[in-house]
Amino acid sequence: FSIRGDNPDDMRRLLDSVKKQAPHLAGIVHLWSIDTEPTESMTVDALVSSTRMGCFSVMHLVQALAGTTGLAVDDVCLVTHAAQPLDHRDCAPRIAQSPVWGFGRVAINEYQNLRCRLVDLATCSGEEIASLVDELIAGAGQEDEIALHGELRYVHRLVPVSPATVHGIVPPAAEAPKPFRLEVARPGI
C-alpha cells in the first residue's frame, strides 16, 4: 500500500483501510516533513517538494481524519527537524518546515478533537529519537508545542513578570499614563 502525501484521495483511502483493521489508534506520527534541505541550500524545486510533503500532506491528513467516521485517534503528532529556533535571535536551520508548525497551530485550534501536537527535533540524533519515542509513549501531558534538542525538552511557558522587571525593556512612552495621538506621516501607505 503506498500513498502520495499531496493526494487527498490517497489519504482518505489509507484511513478507510486502517479503520477496517483498527477502529481505534493510539496515535499517528507524521514524519514526512523531516527530510528537507537546510535553508542555505534550499532551491525553488526543493521548496515546492518540501511544501508538498510537509504542509500539504499534513493538511490532507487532518482533513481526512476530520472527515472519517468510525475511526478514533488519540493523538496526532507532527514532527519536524530544526524548524523552530529556540532563541528569537536565531534563524531556523530548516525554514521550509516552518509552515508545518503554522498549519499545526491552526489544526490545534480548529480540530481540537484530534489532539494535534507539534514536536521539533534539532538533529534527529539517536538520543532525540529516543526522546521522541518517550514523548509519544508518555503522552506528555497538556503540551502541544515541544522542541526536543538533545536530551532537553523545551515548551512554551507564560511566567508572571513584575513591573520592576519590565522597566527598561518597555519604552517609557508605553508606560506613560497620559493620552497620546498617532498621526499618519504619509497617507496611502
Regions inferred by a protein language model and the residue ranges of each:
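4′-phosphopantetheine-dependent carrier domains
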Residues: F1-R153, P187-I189
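Short N-terminal strand-loop motif that marks the start
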Residues: E145-I189
